[in-house]
Amino acid sequence: VLYAAGRTFIAGADIKEFGKPQGDPQLRDVIAAIENSPKPVVAALHGTPLGGGLEVALGCHYRVALPGTRAGTPEVKLGLIPGAGGTQRLPRAIGVEAALDMVTSGRFVPAEEALELGLLDAIATESDPLAAGVTFAKEILDAKLPPRPLSGWNDRLACDPGIFDETREKLRRKTRGQLSPLAGVDAVEAATKLDFAEGMKREREIFRDCMESPQRAALIHAFFGERAVAKVPGLSEETAPREVNSVAVIGAGTMGGGIALALAAAGLHVDLIEKSQDALDAGLSRIRKTLDSSVSRGSLTAAQAEERLGRTGPARGSDHLGGAAAGRAGNRREKSSTSS
């Protein structure tokens, strides 16, 4: 039984290591050793088995998961494809169409869907991954089931050859120049045209091309950048969040009105600031039309719309902004400001 302690099964590689020389043993070789075991190997999954973690699970002969488990191949979001056999084993497990979806979207698949697709053999009733794995392993032994390497499964590779070009066309329209989704299609297509060993070689070639791409470097830079902006230098983890009750939004145009609506929906009072009364009136009119449209669609009740409109107050000039700034300086719990 292969399982992980803590909050999750293997959740993928350390992104900080991407692009650096890899040491031995290579992950694909470790997975091959697991798959070639003469004894059945059960992967007991929980949390979020992602990327290389899911590839390890695919190298096992059977897979059982705790309720709430979500699995995926998010490499595409970082400009990559699964590089340790994921594009070759996944279509053998769940079929070509489902594999294309997972590899090119990077979405997380919940346990119930994974079971339906064939990615899982069972969803456990236990709350502990080791106990779940042992229970399932005993069932395998009682049934005298043999090892079941996915590398030898070819039945689910049958598909309409046109699916690959259709998927590429959809992705070109949707992803607008992103390379890794198309690379994922190429790798999954290789699984249907080459034997497993040759498919693995092709996957590796495609993975290396992605790894050397400036797009991959840019996407990983953006990944870390998005997380860095959430950290305030010099602010300790013990610092309590500041309570914000009122916000000033400068500009009542389309974007400013949208920001004001979002803040009002969050329960905040909004001072909407413009230079002229005409601009203020136009901005408030747009906000009311947006709320009326939400009521017409049924996404808001009339009472909710009026409540949000009531939290949005008009103001001319920068006096209110000055008040907001003074409020921050004098009472950090009362007022903030933003500009659109």
What are these regions (language model features)?
Residues 7, 11, 55-59, 102-206, ...:
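Amphipathic alpha-helical segments at domain termini/boundaries
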Residues 34-78, 82, 251-254, 259-260:
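Glycine-rich beta-to-alpha active-site loop
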